[in-house]
Amino acid sequence: MVVKIGIIKSGNIGTSPVLDLLLDERADRPNIDVRVFGSGAKMNPEQVEDVVPKVDQFDPDFCIFISPNPGAPGPAKARELLSEKDIPAIIIGDAPGKGKKDEMDEQGLGYIIVMSDPMIGAKREWLDPTEMAIFNADILKVLAETGALRLVQNTIDGVIDGAAAGNIELPKLIITAEKAVEAAGFENPYAKAKAIAAYEMAGAVANLDMKGCFMTKGFENFIPLVAAAHEMAASAAALADEAREIEKGNDSVLRTPHMKEGNTGCKTDLISKPE
């Protein structure tokens, strides 16, 4: 069976650019078919109301909606629209979504909340396209190297298996540092500690960016705050790199590629084949 997955992207978090790619990293997985629908950088209710219905034309077995802050007006509208459809749906969001998990339960929606996928320092006096890209690259590195993205991959793969078996169980997952590094499979305890530190640092970026973006007046006051937040993101990425380098030195980097049947393989030794 080929499982059809509809992905709706509205706005952007660090996980967004690679979400569909995590499920088919070499574009040769035979048991899934994915379509992505998006509203670009904007996530207002009017964009959401336009893009969410487009998933119906693909007739997916389940769909995923990913955006910042699942409680914001646009994503809240998306949740409302998805809860009314006869399609199992999963919401992927950042830390503010944790406060909406009871609502998502009531709406019959699954969720994956990536706690350390932080908001960006979105002030015109600071953020240009180059800075935006650098920030997202740093956060993506943290999420990949600490294991958070592998946990997203594994969780959605579980839903795919359920869909193929005719029994979808929607996830209810809050990705903490501990859960992320468990998925990463670190063998060296120092590498694991560095990865935990990197994940928690990335989570703290959001607090500083929120202070700079919403709680501080005067560009001379908020620019240092959002700049500091982005420096924290860069440092978190460097720390995550250090964790992976330790595992490389031990030849113990866990790799979990999708196999030719679509199932997940596993290997650690570099010069070996996944099983």
Curated annotation (Swiss-Prot):
Q: Which reaction does it catalyse?
A: 5,10-methylenetetrahydromethanopterin + oxidized coenzyme F420-(gamma-L-Glu)(n) + 2 H(+) = 5,10-methenyl-5,6,7,8-tetrahydromethanopterin + reduced coenzyme F420-(gamma-L-Glu)(n)
User: What disulfide bonds does the UniProt entry report for this chain?
Assistant: none
The family database entries (InterPro entries) matched by this protein are listed as: MTD, MTD_sf
Q: What is its EC number?
A: 1.5.98.1
BP GO annotations: methanogenesis, from carbon dioxide; one-carbon metabolic process
Q: In which pathway does it act?
A: One-carbon metabolism; methanogenesis from CO(2); 5,10-methylene-5,6,7,8-tetrahydromethanopterin from 5,10-methenyl-5,6,7,8-tetrahydromethanopterin (coenzyme F420 route): step 1/1
Domain of life, per UniProt, equals Archaea
MF terms from GO for this chain are: ferredoxin hydrogenase activity; methylenetetrahydromethanopterin dehydrogenase activity
Q: Which UniProt keywords apply?
A: Methanogenesis, One-carbon metabolism, Oxidoreductase
The record ties this protein, via Gene3D superfamilies, to: 6.10.140.120, F420-dependent methylenetetrahydromethanopterin dehydrogenase (MTD)
Described by its record, this protein's role is as follows: Catalyzes the reversible reduction of methenyl-H(4)MPT(+) to methylene-H(4)MPT.
Q: Which NCBIfam families match?
A: PRK00994.1
Q: Which family does it belong to?
A: Belongs to the MTD family.
HAMAP family registered for this protein in UniProt: MTD (MF_00058)
Name of the protein this chain belongs to: F420-dependent methylenetetrahydromethanopterin dehydrogenase
Q: Which organism is it from?
A: Methanobrevibacter smithii (strain ATCC 35061 / DSM 861 / OCM 144 / PS)
